[in-house]
Design a protein with these regions (language model features):
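N-terminal domain-onset segments
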Residues: 2-84, 88, 95-165, 172-190
């Protein structure tokens, strides 16, 4: 049995475990699903292998599913140099959902060509990091158990109240450890 602890998640922007996911839920005037912290040692396979690492999720999911990963942007907005998007990552061949997530990207940390590609939103950030040879550090801040709500259920094809696993991750510049992205990544039942 996995151990988890409840988090106090009342519409608190920049919550260390749910931001930027909470921003999209707040904008849609929808209550966040039940989200609890879980120790990485208690995450079952294959979720542990997919979440507990310091790599980008795009390449990790591509390797696991033996397919290229595509991006479907559900919502997006920009506030000066901060670009937010709510996304679904899909396998290319079957268009099967392999991740639901929310990301805040600090555009000014990227070269102009990469910035343009990020905002065009035709590829996942992980793919763009590789395409533009951008070095980064990936540092998961915590691991999550999410009780699937109707919204996530529709996206990830799971029943309400199903237990899903995810992580809260931050990407940093390797030289000065300045943040380049904040991410919540939620995996479907595999």
């Amino acid at each position: 049995m996995t151990q988890s602890k409840s988090l106090n998640l009342t519409t608190n922007f920049d919550n260390e475990f749910t931001f930027p996911l909470d921003e999209f839920y707040n904008l849609s005037k929808t209550k966040l699903p039940v989200i609890k912290a879980i120790d990485k040692l208690n995450i079952p396979e294959p979720y542990k292998s997919l979440l507990v690492h310091e790599r980008d999720m795009t390449s990790t999911l591509g390797q696991f599913h033996a397919d290229k990963i595509q991006l479907d942007v559900l919502n997006q907005h920009q506030q000066e140099n901060e670009y937010y998007r709510e996304v679904l990552l899909l396998t290319k061949s079957e268009r099967r959902p392999v991740e639901y997530g929310a990301i805040k990207i600090f555009l000014h940390k990227f070269p102009e060509s990469a910035r343009k590609a990020i905002v065009e939103a035709t590829a996942p950030l992980g793919q763009l990091l590789h395409d533009y040879n951008i070095n980064y550090l990936s540092k998961p801040k915590g691991f999550l158990v999410i009780e699937c709500d109707s919204y996530i259920g529709d996206l990830l094809e799971c029943k309400e109240k199903t237990r899903l696993f995810g992580r809260r991750n931050s990407l940093y510049e390797p030289n000065n450890h300045s943040k380049i992205a904040e991410i919540v990544e939620i995996l479907p039942i595999t």
